[in-house]
Amino acid sequence: MACRPRSPPGYGSRRDGGASPRSPARWSLGRKRRADGRDRKPEDSEEGELQTADHRPESFTTPEGHKPRSRCSDWASAVEEDEMRTRVNKEIARYKRKLLINDFGRERKSSSGSSDSKESMSSVPADVETDESVLMRRQKQINYGKNTIAYDRYIKEVPRHLRQPGIHPRTPNKFKKYSRRSWDQQIKLWKVALHFWDPPAEEGCDLQEIQPVDLGEMETEFTESSSESQTSSQDNFDVYAGTPTKVRHVDCQVEDEFDLEACLTEPLKDFSAMS
């Protein structure tokens, strides 16, 4: 009885067309035409290689922008904005709670048992700004005004319990509803009022101190040249307010003290004989 030779392992799987896809024939990589008869482009081979090599979706990597972005400034602004948003949300919640407490106290004082008084005082004021973007913009403007030397001097020289309305500047209430123009005007007036507490020049900069001038010596010189100053006062006015021809004419009159022609015509002295 004849025995059939054994086939090598894996032969049946290859014969049955196994799970692994067949690689393209070597001759197909260098051909100039595709299967449909059109010319083969170099992009076609690159796209095919990329598709077989990487099966990740297009959203796997973050697309880069057209221009380089500064990561440090974006990160700092993002952190600052997040901190300001958290602080503003806490402040608006505290402000609403304060309004409710004050309103509840007024309601208890004014209530005399009648339902009309309770209904009139139980409503919460509706003129409260709750827009987060508006509150953050207003907070930035307030921070710019408070981050000054004038504001530091103001809070040190005038404590809170000594401040009087209408005399001392008061920070605008960012939680009240105002129009954009009204709020900007309040911020502008508040910053202008804070300039009253600006430091003097000698404290803020290293300028030389101006020494007082002794006017006694100037009086004697003024009495001697009073006649000349009276005649030349009108000419000096023309120097600053006149035409260039007048300016040139006045300059010649002022410089009459030194006569160039007389100096040139004067005979030279023999300095060797004098020595």
Curated annotation (Swiss-Prot):
Cysteines joined through disulfide linkages: none
Region annotation (Disordered) ranges: 1-88, 103-133, 219-240
Gene disruption: observed consequences: Females show no impaired oogenesis but display a defect in the formation of primordial follicles leading to infertility. Most embryos arrested at the 2-cell stage and fail to complete the second round of DNA replication due to an insufficient supply of histone H3 and H4. Accumulation of histone H2A and H2B is not affected.
Residue numbers bearing the Phosphoserine modification: 20, 23, 59, 182
Modification type Phosphothreonine: residues: 61-62, 171
Region (RNA-binding): 129-198
Protein's cellular compartments: Cytoplasm; Nucleus
Cross-link (Glycyl lysine isopeptide (Lys-Gly) (interchain with G-Cter in SUMO2)): 98
One BP annotation, GO: cap-dependent translational initiation
Domain of life of the source: Eukaryota
Recorded GO MF terms: histone pre-mRNA stem-loop binding; identical protein binding; mRNA binding
Chain ranges for the short sequence motif Nuclear localization signal NLS2 as given in the UniProt record: 96-99
Keywords: Cytoplasm, Isopeptide bond, mRNA processing, Nucleus, Phosphoprotein, Ribonucleoprotein, RNA-binding, Ubl conjugation
Similarity-based family: Belongs to the SLBP family.
Domain notes: Amino acids 31-34, 96-99 and 246-249 are necessary for interaction with the Importin alpha/Importin beta receptor. The first 18 amino acids, amino acids 69-76 and 179-182 are necessary for interaction with TNPO3. Amino acids 31-34, 96-99 and 246-249 are necessary for nuclear localization.
Name of the protein described by the UniProt record: Histone RNA hairpin-binding protein
Species, as recorded: Mus musculus (Mouse)
Organism taxonomic ancestry: Eukaryota, Metazoa, Chordata, Craniata, Vertebrata
Gene: Slbp
